[in-house]
Amino acid sequence: TTVKDYSKLKTKYAGYLEITPDKIINIPLYQFIDNWMNTPYKWGGMDKRGIDCSALMQLLFDSVYNISIPRTSVEQFYARWIDKFRSTQHLSEGDLIFFKTIGNNVVSHVGMYLDNGRFINASSSKGVSIASINDPYWSSRLVGAGRINIELLPKRRK
């Protein structure tokens, strides 16, 4: 991939996030997002034919950060190596954001924070897409966020 390709990618996602392209630094993250963008939602899905929110997060963390996280949003929320917090003021790229969208579960949806109030997720209505935590639908369903604590992560098997 050439520098020009990165420039195009940075410009594209800077537009989605309403930030300047120079703020798009994690190229592997945005390449992953670009590869999965607009993939349809499918509950329990784990591939390009359809994917759900927690599978998207699991694949993203594995592909971009080489970090293995649990399969479901509930397991991700309760993972002991995630430092949870309620405020959205200090969100940074890579933080998981948890929502209660259905049922009696504490958590039923997960996305990953990008920048400027935007997060990547796989939603039942839009598939893999970028949404705003300030959108009334999401802000009213926000449970909290979590930052992976590298010190507490289980060691990966080779």
Per-region residue spans from a language model:
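Extracytoplasmic
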Residues: 36-38, 92, 106, 140
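Extracytoplasmic/secreted envelope proteins and their assembly/folding machinery
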Residues: 26-34, 54-58, 91, 142
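Catalytic cysteine-centered active-site loop
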Residues: 39-93
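Aromatic- and glycine-rich peptidoglycan recognition patches
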Residues: 2, 16-18, 85-87, 103, ...
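Solvent-exposed, acidic/flexible segments
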Residues: 2, 19-26, 46-54, 84-90, ...
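Intrinsically disordered, low-complexity
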Residues: 1-39, 148-158
